[in-house]
Swiss-Prot record:
Disulfide bonds: none annotated. Solcar repeats lie at residues 84-177, 189-281, 289-375. The keyword Transcription regulation does not apply. GO terms for molecular function: ATP:ADP antiporter activity. It is a multi-pass membrane protein. This is ADP,ATP carrier protein 1, mitochondrial. The transmembrane helices are not perpendicular to the plane of the membrane, but cross the membrane at an angle. At least 2 of the odd-numbered transmembrane helices exhibit a sharp kink, due to the presence of a conserved proline residue. Residues 1-76 form a transit peptide. SUPFAM superfamilies: Mitochondrial carrier (SSF103506). ADP:ATP antiporter that mediates import of ADP into the mitochondrial matrix for ATP synthesis, and export of ATP out to fuel the cell. Cycles between the cytoplasmic-open state (c-state) and the matrix-open state (m-state): operates by the alternating access mechanism with a single substrate-binding site intermittently exposed to either the cytosolic (c-state) or matrix (m-state) side of the inner mitochondrial membrane. It comes from Gossypium hirsutum. Keywords: Antiport, Membrane, Mitochondrion, Mitochondrion inner membrane, Repeat, Transit peptide, Transmembrane, Transmembrane helix, Transport. Residues 316-321 are annotated as: Important for transport activity.
Length: 386
């Protein structure tokens, strides 16, 4: 009697979801279940391809029960079961994203307020600059109330669902289009293909969800007017769309889009470049299979790449803030040069410290939430969110 255990439907679907949502280094799903031992051997690379807040090597728990001798030719899971599993993963991933984003929302709002305070001062919505993260928290709670720290979070949570759906739609297409392999085509072709596919997929997804990011930014920076008893500029998410379309048209919702696409490529280039260079040097010997070492390295590299590309984020958000204003930046280059000329280079990094705190808070919450899911459901559903 054949003692080989064949994978269950759920295990096959878990393998498909894992392959479709991780690094370009993994092959696309071709309809057959491949030996999980292959992926376990390659687990050291690509664990942080989506974000530092995702649990590294989280997906391997679902494949651990499948023996490495599993048959390479198996009957595919029925479509309805596959969709059901996908829907559960998608929705639970949304809950996970909502939990982490909501927990870190106060830090995120403070980051955006500090980052865009100079534009707010120009428009009369801020009387004086913030002295730091603590001062921003204190003044925001005093002037607007504790609940205002979550202003703009709804748009940020909503943004997760179309982003993930679009990522599933675009990622495999561009992965096949730029199908370079490191061992076959060499490092630089693989690296260039990784940048191209990631940038193209990111820009394609961004085209559909950018207006939500714009609305989130405007709501988060909508502090009450500096004058006593001042009112807010926007009454909610729908009001942002209505007023922006009335004053600037569709272009107002997409101000800063071009530089955002550049930012995706710059970030991915820095991230994969640093990770691929540092991992073989630092994670050696006993450190190679260390969860903690992998997590710390991924977190440090993610924050390093985010810090290096932070000026691009500042420029795009400062451009967003000019929608509805009489005076606007002519282009991202004009915005960059004006900020440097009038405010100095330090202004491009305002709020960067909050970014690091946000990553810590999000990672801590997700770690706890993952543990809760293991207890309740027996598996983890990652947020995958950007």
């Amino acid at each position: 009697m054949d003692q080989v255990q064949h994978p269950s439907v759920m295990q096959k679907v878990a393998g498909q979801l894992f392959r479709s949502s991780h690094s370009q280094d993994f092959q696309g799903y071709n309809g057959s279940f491949r030996s999980p031992a292959l992926y376990q051997r390659r687990a050291a690379y690509g664990n942080y391809s989506n974000a530092a807040l995702q649990h590294p090597v989280r997906a391997f728990g679902d494949l651990s029960m499948v023996p490495s001798t599993a048959s390479a030719i198996c009957v595919q899971a029925p479509a309805e079961k596959g969709f059901s599993s996908f829907a559960i993963d998608f929705l639970m991933g949304g809950v996970s994203a909502a939990v982490s984003k909501t927990a870190a929302a106060p830090i995120e709002r403070v980051k955006l307020l500090i980052q865009n305070q100079d534009e707010m001062i120009k428009s009369g919505r801020l009387s004086e600059p913030y002295k730091g993260i603590g001062d921003c928290f204190k003044r925001t709670i005093k002037d607007e109330g504790f609940g205002s720290l979550w202003r703009g979070n709804t748009a940020n949570v909503i943004r997760y669902f179309p982003t993930q759906a679009l990522n599933f739609a675009f990622k495999d297409y561009f992965k096949r289009l730029f199908n370079f392999k490191k061992d076959r085509d060499g490092y630089w072709k693989w690296f260039a293909g990784n940048l191209a596919s990631g940038g193209a997929a990111g820009a394609s997804s961004l085209l559909f969800v950018y207006s939500l990011d714009y609305a989130r930014t405007r709501l988060a920076n909508d502090a009450k007017a500096a004058k006593k008893g001042g009112e807010r500029q926007f009454n909610g998410l729908v009001d942002v769309y209505r007023k922006t379309l009335k004053s600037d048209g569709i272009a107002g919702l997409y101000r800063g889009f071009n530089i955002s696409c550049v930012g995706i490529i710059v970030y991915r280039g820095l991230y994969f470049g640093m990770y691929d260079s540092l991992k073989p040097v630092l994670l050696t010997g006993s450190m190679q299979d260390s969860f903690f070492a992998s997590f710390v390295l991924g977190w440090l590299i993610t924050n390093g790449a985010a810090l290096a590309s932070y000026p691009i984020d500042t420029v795009r958000r400062r451009m967003m803030m000019t929608s509805g204003k009489a005076v606007k930046y002519k282009s991202s280059l004009d915005a960059f040069s004006q900020i440097l000329k009038n405010e100095g280079g330090k202004s491009l990094f305002k709020g960067a410290g909050s970014n690091i705190l946000r990553a810590i808070a999000g990672a801590g919450v997700l770690a706890g939430y993952d543990k809760l899911q293991l207890i309740v459901f027996g598996k983890k559903y990652g947020s995958g969110g950007a």
